[in-house]
């Protein structure tokens, strides 16, 4: 992590918050700065961008409803607000974290693997969840079924080395954690598809291996080629 870039981001983001910037401006500013703060390009930065405004489903009262979460990174739901020093805004964001964590549980993710984040891009609150109560047949889990336990807090507005280190740990715990990625087609394409770093780094080896195998066993290669052409 580049601490100088993080410090620069924290200073400017706090100035934006103090001047009354809306949530979207803060969120877009964060997204634009993440690649310079994390120059090693961890997987979750791309996931953070692609998971923006993800479609989710959960219940409110006795009704199932649909919504859009600010960001989903693997099994972590993120809610951004414009200024978490204002209690009314914090409370609204806290409730939405519960909604979005319920939505992750509704798609089959075990509660112990779900984490939630509430942030204004400068202050970061991290939560684990517990499922409480039961749901009736045909109904989804909702915020009333989610109990949040705060497990980490970071305040980058302090602009201290200690808080910057805490943020690095926070990111590792909530965004870059092991086994947090969903195993689906989108993830596989991101990791191994034609636009991935894996592809660009290894395609020449694969190509040479295939060409050599085809030249050594042309009859077998012709059979395989025919099978794929008729697939």
Language model feature labels by segment:
Residues 42-74:
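Active-site metal-binding core of divalent-cation-utilizing nuclease and nuclease-like domains
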Residues 14, 18, 22, 26, ...:
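Conserved aromatic-histidine-acidic binding/catalytic patches
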Residues 68-71, 80, 94-100:
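Well-ordered mid-protein domain cores that form the structural environment of catalytic cofactors
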Residues 33, 37, 100-103, 107:
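Conserved short hydrophobic interaction patches
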Residues 25, 29-33, 92-100, 166, ...:
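Alpha-helical scaffold elements adjacent to nucleotide-binding pockets in ATP/GTP-utilizing enzyme cores
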